[in-house]
Design a protein with these regions (language model features):
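Residue-level detector of alpha-helix boundaries and kinks
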Residues: 12-15, 44, 86-89
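A conserved segment at the C-terminal end of the G1
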Residues: 42-46, 54-71
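Charged, amphipathic alpha-helical linker segments immediately N-terminal to NTP-binding catalytic cores
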Residues: 1-19
Length: 156
C-alpha cells in the first residue's frame, strides 16, 4: 500500500510498461468507472506546440480577476508535482492528491495507466469534487489522443 505522494509517484513511474501508448480507451474506461462527473461549469483546453503553460496561467489569472473560481491542470511540473493541479492559483494539498490516486486505483481494476494518465485522472477527480466555475486543462504530448481530450471543452 502506498501511503505518501513520493511512494505513489515512484510506483507510477514503473507501473506502465510502455513509454508511448496513446489512446483514450484505458483512461476512458477508468473515468467511466469513476462516474465521469462534469468538472466545472466552463472547461477550457489549451493545446499547441509552445506556450501552453503560460497560456494556462494567463487564463487562470484572467478568470480569477473576474471573480471566477478556477482549477487548472498542467504538466510537466517545474519543482513540485503538486503544482500540476491548482485551485485559484494554490497547489493541491499532498493528502488530497494521495486520496485522488487512491480513488483512481480503486476504479482502474487491472487497467494499466501511463504516468500522465494517472496525473490527468487525479486532476479530473479533484476538480470534479471541488466544482470550480472554470477548469483550464493543458494538453500533454498526445494531441487529439491526449488524456485531457477525454473531457469535452467549451473552448480550446
Amino acid at each position: 500500500m502506498k501511503r505518501s505522494l513520493h511512494e505513489w509517484l515512484a510506483w507510477q513511474e514503473t507501473a506502465h510498461d510502455k513509454a508511448w501508448d496513446l489512446g483514450l480507451h484505458r483512461i476512458g474506461a477508468v473515468w467511466q468507472a469513476m462516474g465521469a462527473p462534469r468538472l466545472a461549469r466552463h472547461i477550457i483546453t489549451v493545446a499547441g506546440t509552445n506556450g501552453k503553460g503560460s497560456c494556462v496561467c494567463w487564463t487562470e489569472g484572467l478568470c480569477q480577476a473576474h471573480g471566477a473560481s478556477v482549477a487548472s491542470f498542467s504538466s510537466p511540473h517545474l519543482s513540485d508535482y503538486r503544482e500540476r493541479i491548482r485551485f485559484d492559483g494554490a497547489w493541491v494539498d499532498e493528502a488530497e492528491l494521495v486520496a485522488a490516486f487512491e480513488a483512481v486505483d480503486a476504479a482502474r481494476g487491472d487497467i494499466s495507466l501511463s504516468y500522465f494518465e494517472w496525473s490527468a485522472l487525479a486532476a479530473f477527480h479533484l476538480i470534479a469534487r471541488r466544482q470550480p466555475q472554470v477548469a483550464v486543462l493543458e494538453v500533454g504530448l498526445g494531441g487529439r489522443l491526449d488524456a485531457t481530450n477525454l473531457i469535452d471543452a467549451e473552448a480550446a
